[in-house]
């Protein structure tokens, strides 16, 4: 196996494990929490608190990592895996204390989101050190890991109960921790790392105001992304309720998650070729339009067929957004700002989730499914308009409006 295949395989394995656990923790959050007696509103509150904490935590951690001290991308991922493992082990055995379940689940939900941008930053860090990683392929295989887990976990939970979810998470996180521990540069890559530390780079923009003043178009993309993921998280966090309203159950939940995740693989694997012709900024706008169509379909859905049609738009929405966002940051930002840039992308996803969590459960409990989906559609449409405005703004202060740089 050549070095390119070796590094890509290792990074793909980290992504597969991450998104398998993402399925059991995030995609199945409502299933697990409602099995412990939580209402829709309580689920929404818990996820909102976890998302708010994560949105605040991510840029802070990114700034620490960007300063290149003891805390590296790899070490933070290892710490995160350990925390999620311990928390999931606690959830497996705590069944009757809702306050404890609330706190522990919020922590592991928050930590898992917090290390997602660090996973992306790890790839681009290693690439700069000479580790030839095909990001799109590895990230797409992560989605395939989510898809395969979804296909089995829905039926398994229906048969064995929601207690299975934290048990599976414990196993996945144990494997992840071992894999991360051994996934590190050696030899030539370490020499490149040492050279990088002594070389000197552009000034890091630690303050939020300084950062977004330096990258005006990125600020608009972040705001647009919040709107996109308001709609996206509304569907994902309350998917079981949407599916039940359309006549399905946990098995259909698994199939639905499988469909949207497996469709991500070919797009992410081929995104490098697309980026030779289309700029990351334009792809971000395109993905926003796909998020809009995806939730719009659900307003008029009458059965599970339309749910699957809606989920198929993941091919153009999330599957395009994630790699396009990663490449946008990598190509337009100074090296010492890139972990923060990746963190702000994930923070936008998280903040969208916060507003969705705060409103969706309340709207669902008091007004019903369709008003919830109409709200998500309207917010997503605003995001599409903002993303178009971003194309007319410079990516860095003093530049012309966005133009892709190879």
State what each model feature region is:
Residues 16, 98-115, 226, 306-320:
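Hydrophobic core of transmembrane alpha-helices in multi-pass small-molecule transporters
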Residues 40-41, 129-141, 250-251, 333-345:
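Loop-to-transmembrane helix entry/capping segments in MFS-fold secondary transporters
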Residues 1-5, 184-222:
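Juxtamembrane intracellular "pre-TM" segments in multi-pass secondary transporters
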């Amino acid at each position: 196996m050549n070095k390119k295949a070796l590094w890509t395989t290792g990074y793909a394995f980290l992504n597969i494990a991450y998104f398998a656990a993402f399925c059991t923790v995030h995609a199945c959050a409502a299933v697990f929490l409602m099995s412990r007696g939580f209402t829709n509103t309580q689920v929404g509150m818990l996820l909102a608190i976890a998302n708010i904490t994560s949105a605040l935590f991510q840029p802070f951690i990114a700034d620490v990592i960007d300063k290149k001290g003891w805390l590296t991308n790899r070490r933070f991922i290892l710490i995160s895996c350990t925390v999620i493992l311990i928390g999931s082990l606690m959830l497996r055995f705590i069944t009757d204390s809702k306050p404890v379940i609330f706190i522990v689940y919020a922590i592991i939900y928050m930590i898992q989101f917090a290390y997602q941008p660090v996973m992306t930053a790890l790839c681009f860090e290693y690439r700069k050190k000479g580790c030839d990683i095909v990001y799109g392929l590895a990230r797409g295989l992560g989605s395939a890991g989510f898809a395969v887990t979804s296909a089995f976990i829905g039926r398994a939970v229906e048969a064995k109960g929601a207690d299975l979810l934290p048990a599976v998470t414990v196993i996945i996180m144990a494997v992840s921790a071992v894999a991360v521990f051994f996934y590190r540069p050696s030899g030539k890559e370490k020499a490149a790392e040492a050279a990088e530390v002594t070389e000197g780079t552009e000034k890091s923009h630690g303050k939020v105001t300084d950062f977004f003043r330096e990258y005006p178009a990125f600020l608009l993309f972040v705001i647009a992304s919040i709107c996109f993921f308001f709609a996206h998280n509304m569907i994902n966090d309350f998917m079981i309720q949407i599916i039940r309203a359309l006549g399905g159950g946990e098995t259909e939940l698994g199939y639905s998650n499988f469909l949207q995740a497996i469709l991500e693989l070919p797009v992410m694997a081929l995104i490098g070729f697309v980026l030779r012709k289309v700029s990351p900024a334009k792809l971000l706008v395109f993905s926003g339009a796909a998020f809009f169509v995806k939730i719009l379909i659900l307003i008029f859905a009458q059965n599970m067929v339309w749910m699957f049609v809606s989920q198929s738009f993941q091919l153009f929405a999330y599957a395009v957004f994630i790699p396009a966002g990663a490449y946008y940051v990598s190509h337009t930002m100074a090296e010492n700002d890139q972990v923060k840039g990746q963190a702000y992308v994930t923070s936008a996803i998280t903040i969208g989730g916060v507003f969705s969590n705060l409103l969706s459960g309340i709207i669902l409990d008091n007004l019903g499914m369709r008003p919830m989906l109409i709200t998500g559609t309207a917010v997503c449409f605003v995001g599409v308009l903002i993303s178009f405005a971003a194309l007319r703004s410079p990516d860095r202060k003093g530049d012309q409006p966005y133009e892709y740089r190879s």
